[in-house]
């Protein structure tokens, strides 16, 4: 008899040796439970959404999240639409090495960029947050973004073909983004 997985082999071997107790049988591993990095929220007046492993720049996402944190939802959506149109630049306060100076920044600082791809994905997440608020009967005009966080996620291995049959290993970056809105009075 051929056994295909290691769990069957272990369980059959233990039963053969007379060790088949519930604590000795290996448990099936679960998927990880991904929570939010903010706690202590009022469940009746808050709404959450998250984007996991998005193919956008973590640096641009951190700067965008820092910019929209504390804004009302319609104001944040307008700002992101203007960033996509290249009308307003996002100030890069943390990742500002070799970043050019911009005149039309979101706040008083010298370095900034127009992170269009990250702004587009964040705009989609804001629309999801708005849909979640409408589903929970919250007023979207009074919804304030109290938590916006971006973290680096897993790397995606990629190959770049080179001459003579060789290839270089590249790593694509992904980002986790969390948004929490609170219905202000």
What do the PLM-derived regions correspond to, one by one?
Residues 1-30:
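N-terminal amphipathic/basic-hydrophobic helices that include classical n-h-c signal peptides
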Residues 140-163:
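Extended, charged amphipathic interaction segments
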Residues 30-139, 180:
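Ribosome large-subunit tunnel/peptidyl-transferase-proximal elements
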Residues 56, 163-164:
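Short, solvent-exposed beta-edge and connector elements
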Residues 39, 148, 182-184:
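Generic beta-structure capping elements
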Residues 14, 66, 161:
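Short glycine- and Lys/Arg-enriched binding-loop motifs that mark or flank ligand-binding interfaces
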Residues 165-185:
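C-terminal edge-of-domain segments
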